Amino acid sequence: MSATKMNAQEIIKFIADAKKKTPVKVTFNGELHGTIPWSVVKLGNVLFGDWEEIKPLLVNLEENKTYVVEQDARNSAVPLLDKRDINARIEPGAIIRDQVEIGDNAVIMMGAVINIGAEIGAGTMIDMGAILGGRAIVGKNSHVGAGAVLAGVIEPASAEPVRVGDNVLIGANAVVIEGVQIGSGSVVAAGAIVTQDVPENVVVAGVPARIIKTIDEKTQQKTALEDALRTL
């Protein structure tokens, strides 16, 4: 599913202009009186909607006036992505904000956090607890390891985002700093902190990350991806 690609200025405007909402689920006993706004959904004795619109309804709740409120955000500007029609595997607990583009057969694992404007290529896996900041771009058939961070750039608007090429492996807990580009076919070792651009088909490691060798057959075997994990 393709989102409308937005540059930094458009994302900033999107957030600034968005109506800030506190989405809630309210389960209640008793009878509601008064008109329910069109934006509030009522299913039996459960209400879904913005707290600012639901709160006045509860004042008119008759009988025992018992209700429970469930919420996970306050004055949120960016909703979560509607994942229903995305042709990818997205596991429970992944947090993906609106205006994110996810390619076919990508895999998003539990606990991954993907911010507004990020792009994930077809067949790419974002592993458990990895973070893709705003506007971060990952190419096709790559792997971002567990706990890795691709730094986001929303402000300043002139800054360049992180760009990761195709067939790249980023090891667990690695960090890629704002504006860095990782060339296709390269490997970033676990725990590395990448502060400069990385050319294609090399291995980088360390803090700060430095090139330690070019990709050879042994490295390719160790870092090969499993297509079966991307089958839907």
From Swiss-Prot:
<dbReference type="InterPro" id="IPR018357">
    <property type="entry name" value="Hexapep_transf_CS"/>
</dbReference>
<dbReference type="InterPro" id="IPR001451">
    <property type="entry name" value="Hexapep"/>
</dbReference>
<keyword id="KW-0028">Amino-acid biosynthesis</keyword>
<dbReference type="Pfam" id="PF00132">
    <property type="entry name" value="Hexapep"/>
</dbReference>
<keyword id="KW-0457">Lysine biosynthesis</keyword>
<keyword id="KW-0808">Transferase</keyword>
<comment type="function">
    <text>Catalyzes the transfer of an acetyl group from acetyl-CoA to tetrahydrodipicolinate.</text>
</comment>
<protein>
    <recommendedName>
        <fullName>2,3,4,5-tetrahydropyridine-2,6-dicarboxylate N-acetyltransferase</fullName>
        <ecNumber>2.3.1.89</ecNumber>
    </recommendedName>
</protein>
<comment type="similarity">
    <text>Belongs to the transferase hexapeptide repeat family. DapH subfamily.</text>
</comment>
<dbReference type="InterPro" id="IPR011004">
    <property type="entry name" value="Trimer_LpxA-like_sf"/>
</dbReference>
<dbReference type="Pfam" id="PF08503">
    <property type="entry name" value="DapH_N"/>
</dbReference>
<dbReference type="InterPro" id="IPR013710">
    <property type="entry name" value="DapH_N"/>
</dbReference>
<comment type="pathway">
    <text>Amino-acid biosynthesis; L-lysine biosynthesis via DAP pathway; LL-2,6-diaminopimelate from (S)-tetrahydrodipicolinate (acetylase route): step 1/3.</text>
</comment>
<keyword id="KW-0012">Acyltransferase</keyword>
<dbReference type="InterPro" id="IPR050179">
    <property type="entry name" value="Trans_hexapeptide_repeat"/>
</dbReference>
<keyword id="KW-0677">Repeat</keyword>
<dbReference type="InterPro" id="IPR019873">
    <property type="entry name" value="DapH"/>
</dbReference>
<dbReference type="GO" id="GO:0009089">
    <property type="term" value="P:lysine biosynthetic process via diaminopimelate"/>
</dbReference>
<dbReference type="GO" id="GO:0019877">
    <property type="term" value="P:diaminopimelate biosynthetic process"/>
</dbReference>
<keyword id="KW-0220">Diaminopimelate biosynthesis</keyword>
<dbReference type="GO" id="GO:0047200">
    <property type="term" value="F:tetrahydrodipicolinate N-acetyltransferase activity"/>
</dbReference>
<dbReference type="Pfam" id="PF14602">
    <property type="entry name" value="Hexapep_2"/>
</dbReference>
